[in-house]
């Protein structure tokens, strides 16, 4: 997989950088694995906006992805690599020996015709799913379960992978993409290898309209709004916030306040917290 740059024929193509989609082998999804999905546009069950700047965009059909990998010890053949409009990662269409078809997150390097399998005594190969207890130390894994049997909940985005650091008792220590080291039960399943389409981080949409196609609406700073729209709004010209610190549109402290509960039960499973990202690495001054 590679990325494509365009000649500056228009302002939109001047900055546009996209993936070349060379790994996509079929344009049409598997009919039995797609369902329609109501788009909530950032609203909750009461119709109140809880996530701003969402709405519009091209219509989508949801692909049913197998995050559990619960067909144990049954060989599956990778029949195709498909595009998924709901995520940056690609999907691999599996044909099982018993005739069932399923989608999984496509690992990096997976090829059409390759066989994958899930179980406790399976080969140590990329794309195979197995419990963390049998994975070699130093292995790169993705689609990690937090609770056995619940399905993969971590490390699912394009190019992501976690590393098996240590095994002790009933737990396995994983170094997550955020650099956090967390303990996970050894019976939880994960898939060997990293998620494919890692070049997505080097792409650029090129124009605002392309972002609208993805269902993202324009973002506006609170300081240029009216007081009725945002706590930062109002004043003459470029007025300061007028508060001790920045807040969210709902008046809660923002930018730096820790929101994780101090007494959360899973705190004991976090061996090392994630590295703090300085303002220098985000393009601003170091804090």
Curated annotation (Swiss-Prot):
Quaternary organization: Part of the 50S ribosomal subunit. Forms a bridge to the 30S subunit in the 70S ribosome.
Record protein name field: Large ribosomal subunit protein uL2
Organism of this sequence: Prochlorococcus marinus (strain MIT 9312)
UniProt feature, compositional bias: Basic residues: 258-287
Coiled-coil stretches noted in the UniProt entry, renumbered to this chain: none
One of the GO BP terms on file: translation
Top-rank taxon: Bacteria
Pfam families: Ribosomal_L2, Ribosomal_L2_C
Known function: One of the primary rRNA binding proteins. Required for association of the 30S and 50S subunits to form the 70S ribosome, for tRNA binding and peptide bond formation. It has been suggested to have peptidyltransferase activity; this is somewhat controversial. Makes several contacts with the 16S rRNA in the 70S ribosome.
InterPro entries named in the record: NA-bd_OB-fold, Rib_uL2_dom2, Ribosomal_uL2, Ribosomal_uL2_bac/org-type, Ribosomal_uL2_C, Ribosomal_uL2_CS, Ribosomal_uL2_dom3, Ribosomal_uL2_RNA-bd_dom
């Amino acid at each position: 997989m590679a990325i494509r740059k365009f000649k500056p024929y228009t302002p939109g193509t001047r900055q546009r950088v996209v993936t070349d989609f060379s790994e996509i082998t079929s344009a049409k999804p598997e009919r039995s694995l797609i369902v329609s999905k109501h788009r909530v546009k950032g609203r909750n069950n009461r119709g109140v906006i809880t996530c701003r700047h969402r709405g519009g965009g091209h219509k989508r059909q949801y692909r049913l992805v197998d995050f559990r990998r619960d067909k144990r010890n049954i060989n599956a053949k990778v029949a195709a690599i498909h595009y998924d409009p709901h995520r940056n990662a690609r999907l691999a269409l599996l044909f099982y020996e018993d005739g069932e078809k399923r989608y999984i997150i496509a690992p990096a390097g997976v090829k059409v015709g390759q066989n994958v399998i899930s179980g406790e005594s399976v080969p140590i190969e990329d794309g195979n799913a197995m419990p963390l207890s049998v994975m070699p130390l130093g292995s790169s894994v993705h689609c990690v379960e937090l609770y056995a049997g619940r399905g993969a909940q971590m490390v699912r985005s394009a190019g992501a992978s976690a590393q098996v650091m240590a095994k002790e008792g009933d737990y396995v220590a994983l170094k997550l993409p955020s650099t956090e080291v967390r303990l996970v039960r050894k019976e939880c399943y994960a898939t060997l290898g990293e998620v494919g389409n890692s070049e997505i981080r080097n792409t650029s949409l090129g124009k605002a309209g392309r972002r609208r196609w993805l269902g993202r609406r324009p973002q506006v700073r609170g300081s240029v709004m009216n007081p009725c729209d945002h706590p930062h709004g109002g004043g003459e010209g470029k007025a300061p916030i007028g508060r001790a610190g920045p807040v969210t549109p709902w008046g809660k402290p923002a930018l730096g306040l820790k929101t994780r509960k101090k007494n959360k039960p899973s705190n004991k499973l976090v061996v090392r917290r994630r590295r703090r990202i300085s303002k220098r690495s985000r393009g601003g001054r170091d804090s």
